[in-house]
Amino acid sequence: MAKEKFERSKPHVNVGTIGHVDHGKTTLTAALTTILAKKFGGAAKAYDQIDNAPEEKARGITINTSHVEYETETRHYAHVDCPGHADYVKNMITGAAQMDGAILVCSAADGPMPQTREHILLARQVGVPYIIVFMNKCDMVDDAELLELVEMEIRDLLSSYDFPGDDCPIVQGSALKALEGDAAYEEKIFELAAALDSYIPTPERAVDKPFLLPIEDVFSISGRGTVVTGRVERGIIHVGDEIEIVGLKETQKTTCTGVEMFRKLLDEGQAGDNVGVLLRGTKREDVERGQVLAKPGTITPHTKFKAEVYVLSKEEGGRHTPFFANYRPQFYFRTTDVTGAVTLEEGVEMVMPGENVTITVELIAPIAMEEGLRFAIREGGRTVGAGVVSSVIA
């Protein structure tokens, strides 16, 4: 059979499985690919194909992640599944796989467990906007009342972390039985897919968001002015647009008088393009790497924020010793390092390599910042951790 052409017509959504070890995340991932492939096309993946997750690097951190894809009637999904708990923590904090929504897998036989709670908290901290629940292994529970109790417990847990526990779709099923071809449980997989389709809104595409370009380099071109280069992170820049230069110094206003790519002049540059932007009346020394160009009023510079961070273990090339309050590493945002002082949460004396923890950071220079911004923690150019801004303080 000839290979099918990849259809770009359906909107694309990123999801992933989260939940406690051995509650059936990988089995559910296999069931989704296998059962949806029968109806909507796509490739079925077996459990061991998914479980054998390849290593990848994100922000200098090695993570094992499996990527699969499947389709529903209206959408194309990319789905991530991780083999170990530490991989989930790293994946969610580094944003290696940005999720538009997560499928929380919880065993009906065991109910919510410590990692169920931890993954919900992480999802909240790193800004996963929607959670859908799959209660797995329901074939092992004969008592309908028990299923109801577990469902209530999951809803309460979601609500306690500011997710709308009462409204989150919860599908009761058995991934293993579905894989074995039990029609009633196969139906539950379709029910889960329908919940994904209806509950997670179609994500806004990067080009539709407000313009942002992290500055990588600055040149002065005689007779033309100052050019900054970088990759457009989101939105579109048109010739003639007013823009702001944000971060490290006072915010400056300027106008884009030219956009070029591969030495050709363009009318606009959009998300994903590596461009040079010509700035009217801006001096070479007023702009530097580490600032961003942005649509006016869409992003502001900040020095103080709360973050969720993962600290690399010694084996991963991280620190060999713990760090304490007032630790002062460099925080690498987008294209530059800024030194910052760390404050630990009340009752936390120190942070060991290999842990994930909430910290407050005060930078010595302001960075264009918003919730969800990812960063690396470095010491002398070596990555020792990764983090995500969970809230901006000042």
Curated annotation (Swiss-Prot):
Binding site for GTP: 19-26, 81-85, 136-139
Region spans: G4: 136-139
Chain segments carrying region G2: 60-64
Entry GO CC: cytoplasm
Domain tr-type G: 10-204
Enzyme class, broadest EC rank: hydrolase
Enzyme Commission number: 3.6.5.3
G5 as annotated region, ranges: 174-176
Binding-site residues, Mg(2+): T26
GO terms under biological process: translational elongation
Role of this protein: GTP hydrolase that promotes the GTP-dependent binding of aminoacyl-tRNA to the A-site of ribosomes during protein biosynthesis.
Identification of the protein by name: Elongation factor Tu
Native organism taxonomy: Bacteria, Pseudomonadati, Pseudomonadota, Betaproteobacteria, Neisseriales
Gene field: tufA
